[in-house]
Amino acid sequence: MKCPKILAALLGCAVLAGVPAMPAHAAINSMSLGASYDAQQANITFRVYSSQATRIVLYLYSAGYGVQESATYTLSPAGSGVWAVTVPVSSIKAAGITGAVYYGYRAWGPNWPYASNWGKGSQAGFVSDVDANGDRFNPNKLLLDPYAQEVSQDPLNPSNQNGNVFASGASYRTTDSGIYAPKGVVLVPSTQSTGTKPTRAQKDDVIYEVHVRGFTEQDTSIPAQYRGTYYGAGLKASYLASLGVTAVEFLPVQETQNDANDVVPNSDANQNYWGYMTENYFSPDRRYAYNKAAGGPTAEFQAMVQAFHNAGIKVYMDVVYNHTAEGGTWTSSDPTTATIYSWRGLDNTTYYELTSGNQYFYDNTGIGANFNTYNTVAQNLIVDSLAYWANTMGVDGFRFDLASVLGNSCLNGAYTASAPNCPNGGYNFDAADSNVAINRILREFTVRPAAGGSGLDLFAEPWAIGGNSYQLGGFPQGWSEWNGLFRDSLRQAQNELGSMTIYVTQDANDFSGSSNLFQSSGRSPWNSINFIDVHDGMTLKDVYSCNGANNSQAWPYGPSDGGTSTNYSWDQGMSAGTGAAVDQRRAARTGMAFEMLSAGTPLMQGGDEYLRTLQCNNNAYNLDSSANWLTYSWTTDQSNFYTFAQRLIAFRKAHPALRPSSWYSGSQLTWYQPSGAVADSNYWNNTSNYAIAYAINGPSLGDSNSIYVAYNGWSSSVTFTLPAPPSGTQWYRVTDTCDWNDGASTFVAPGSETLIGGAGTTYGQCGQSLLLLISK
């Protein structure tokens, strides 16, 4: 997640380098918030929440941008902080709105009470931009309904790149945002099916992370008008099925600030590609729709989901409930100036976590303001939007960006050391607190059972910024976690030999599911989401082809600011003249094999199957360019790697011994020294040992074959002595990732394995490579 530098002023962000699952709650969206037609489509009811407003007026428009309102209606309090009004469709048509209905709100409150002489662009009634309670009402700022199901356009777009119109403060408070502001779109319920959801157990999944636009934007096999869209992505379902992928995880698709991406062609100006700047939690991003008419993005997204479901593929979404695109105050010295176009103008104290004095925002996200995730109403919005995406849009699971913020047990005003649930100030992760958002989500939704069935798959990015926010292994039962330690230790083992101490015990722990992180909380190996690379960092190829990041290069591969300096990457000696491209491919094969042969749920980044490169850029959040878009015209080496990846995934899927539902125990898994002796404490404790092997007793895990894996972390060859295979069988080679085996048949098809031998057979394994054998 990254704050685009071009949006820093608009968003007020800094550019910075055990609870059991319960049945779904009956009261999801119990306040019936949003805009909805009645059964006869004769009336539209508008309902919005604000605990502090003293007046709210509905503004209706015939278009989403550039026009004045056609009608206004004053809402009335409906109890429990809800404001409502019902408008006859006949009245809306009489006002000149005969097509889609666009709408927004203007709100008054304690810091800006209503004055009868107020008019758009007026300061009548103004008291302060922010009061002692933290209220930030400003009737000159049209407000997007947090429950809108579609959004007309982004605040910044080809017709408006001026973020000042949405700002408060002395210079901007009277600037009226009405014609520029994003507006909600009233939708007639869609009849588009999302198909039948797969019920596959998560342990059997292979996840493919990809950007919905980048997936097809330069795929020439797809008609031009569908490239980069939900429709186009749905056309790739067969591609993923052929690769062996069982779940596609899309980078954020909720409405985000990206309409200005194309304003300056062939430039990173105005760009926000990844999409971690959510403007609304219910709306599918309109930019990614081929059909951009009202209701088009919703139906098109649903049709895409149906296409994946028809192919047996789950659909996951990356969701960003830790902050919003409104950001924080524009500077740390002026509390009055902040962006207002939705949550902040309706109920700042409900939706954001305020610092002591209520003038600024507490921030563990790098974007300027924590979403107030310990607040019940803010949690309602999270739960309601998740339910909408799961039930109406057909989504099968969610990856939560900076999920540690959803474990925050602090509320506004609880900032002293004596506050019982905030010992560290304005942020405290507390998985034992039943009221934090991560536990509320577990109560509201059914998590998919271990053996499969209906329910959601939940994935946490288990860290944020500051405090006790690094929580890898700290989430409660029901949550799976992105295992950053798996990524780091694997990269270190392959790329840092001689530069840092490498622990073969960590490699063994990674191979077997990371029990040190997940077992004590009652979780299983598959709760570890194992990855080498994802969007946030280098690609698989670059991990093994780059000596650090290069983010300052020219378009289309840069420039990008930020990015970590801790990459654990290495070009395999290419720049030093001791390595070659074949060595880089060997390292990439070894890394991917390590991932796919490990217990846990593997996650790969889109394009890794053909060695996609970003030319060492490790933070390409701002590049809506050909560098970030997948390509399907490959070299011979890329095609060979695709075949390797495809067969490797198929092997994983064919062998249940690699996908255990519980931790390996007893004779199910045996670790060996290269000599063939069982690894003992002396071997494990010797940090000079960089080679290890293991055998999985397949029949004890429902597998027809036993499996032997040898990993040589040394730079030179090591001889492994093979243990005894099951009685009546011998060991056969499936793959050896060494350079000699580079080509189209690095990973052989089933039935084409090469006989190696039985107990006591020796095998010379080249440096920094992996050997895979099966018994038969």
Curated annotation (Swiss-Prot):
Induction: By maltose. GO terms for biological process: carbohydrate metabolic process. InterPro entries: GlgX_Isoamylase_N_E_set, Glyco_hydro_13_cat_dom, Glyco_hydro_13_N, Glyco_hydro_b, Glycoside_hydrolase_SF, Ig-like_fold, Ig_E-set, Isoamylase_C. The keyword Plastid does not apply. GO terms for molecular function: isoamylase activity; metal ion binding. Disulfide bonds join 410-422, 546-616, 738-766. Ca(2+) binds at residues 154, 255-256, 258, 285. Residues 1-26 form the signal peptide. Its EC number is 3.2.1.68. The record marks 536 as: Transition state stabilizer. Binds 1 Ca(2+) ion per subunit. Monomer. Belongs to the glycosyl hydrolase 13 family. This is Isoamylase.
